[in-house]
Regions:
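Conserved N-terminal beta-strand and adjoining loop/helix that marks the start
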Residues: 1-18, 35
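Active-site-adjacent beta-strand/loop module that shapes the phosphate/pyrophosphate-binding cleft
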Residues: 4, 69-95, 105
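Structural detector for helix-capping/boundary residues
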Residues: 7, 34, 48, 89, ...
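Conserved hydrophobic "DFG−1" position in protein kinase catalytic cores
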Residues: 11-12, 20, 87-88, 106
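Acidic surface patches and DE-rich sequence motifs
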Residues: 13, 23, 73-75
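Nudix hydrolase/Nudix homology domain
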Residues: 24-29, 94-117
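Conserved beta-strand segments that form the floor/walls of ligand-binding pockets within enzyme
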Residues: 30, 64, 85-87, 116
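The catalytic Nudix box helix
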Residues: 31-66
Length: 117
């Protein structure tokens, strides 16, 4: 099984909801983030992808390492995805999804009924 490396950022609001995005090519919501370009660091990958996907500029000092997680890739059969995830300090304002993102939503991780993750 081939592996895909990605980096992502967790944004939470004051009620504990998590900001997630849904790409136009997928029914599932996920954290904003994506694949590295060249020899880009994980932090810089997460920052660039977040800016590209939802228009939020993040400073590296606002991030702390949350962990690295591996799971089956949801939209690439025969692959696993290893996500290096960072936690953002503070609540971002006005995410603006770009062309590849169908929607951005604040999702309660304890009650995500009707939302495919």
């Amino acid at each position: 099984m081939s592996n895909i490396d990605v980096a992502a950022i967790v944004f939470t609001d004051d009620t504990g909801r998590v900001l997630c995005v849904r790409k136009r090519t997928s029914p599932r919501f996920q954290l904003p983030g994506g694949k590295p370009e060249g020899d880009e660091t994980k932090v810089h990958t997460a920052i660039r992808e977040t800016r590209e996907e939802i228009g939020i500029d993040v400073d590296a000092e606002q991030l702390s390492y949350l962990g690295t997680f591996t799971a089956k890739a949801s939209n690439e059969p025969g692959h696993t995805v290893t996500s290096t995830v960072f936690l953002h300090v503070g609540v971002p304002t006005d995410p603006a999804p770009d062309a590849e993102i169908a929607e951005a939503a604040w999702i309660d991780p304890a009650d995500h009924t009707g939302v495919e993750l």
